[in-house]
């Protein structure tokens, strides 16, 4: 259900570091730099988890990103995360009652037809 952010443990995920190149009739795989090599370029005090394209910086305290701040690492992506909870059944019922369409039955008194002798019609 959903996408897995990181492969680990007993999961068997294809490597994201391999890229196929065709040379003649042979297919050869070339490797991109491994995470250990990329981790050496990070500032001290930072840890990474996950694949290179999904790595997340873990640092003590909270981190905020100002809108004008450009990342030095173009592979680093930020995301807004919202935690939502399911409403309880009572809340759902209450909301449904608030938004429900109201119906009314209108009863008009039955008109008694009268005969108009001048025109010869019912009025």
UniProtKB/Swiss-Prot annotation:
The keyword Phosphoprotein applies. Residues 44-54 have a biased composition (Basic and acidic residues). Transmembrane segments: none annotated. InterPro entries: DUF4578. Residues 32-43 have a biased composition (Low complexity). Keywords: Phosphoprotein. Residues 17-74 are annotated as: Disordered. GO terms for cellular component: extracellular exosome. It comes from the Eukaryota. The modification Phosphothreonine is found at residue 30. Pfam families: DUF4578. The modification Phosphoserine is found at residue 62. This is Uncharacterized protein C11orf52. It comes from Homo sapiens. The lineage of its organism: Eukaryota, Metazoa, Chordata, Craniata, Vertebrata. The gene is C11orf52.
């Amino acid at each position: 259900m959903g996408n897995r952010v990181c492969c680990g443990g007993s999961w068997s995920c294809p490597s994201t570091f391999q890229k196929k190149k065709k040379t003649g009739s042979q297919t050869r795989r070339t490797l991109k730099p491994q995470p250990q090599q990329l981790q050496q370029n990070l500032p001290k005090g930072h840890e990474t988890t996950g694949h290179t394209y999904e790595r997340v910086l873990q640092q003590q305290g909270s981190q905020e990103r100002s809108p004008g701040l450009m990342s030095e690492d173009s592979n680093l992506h930020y995301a807004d995360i919202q935690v939502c909870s399911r409403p309880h059944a009572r809340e759902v019922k209450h909301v449904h009652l608030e938004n429900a369409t109201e119906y009314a039955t209108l009863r008009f008194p039955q008109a008694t037809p009268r005969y108009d002798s001048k025109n010869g019609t019912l009025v």
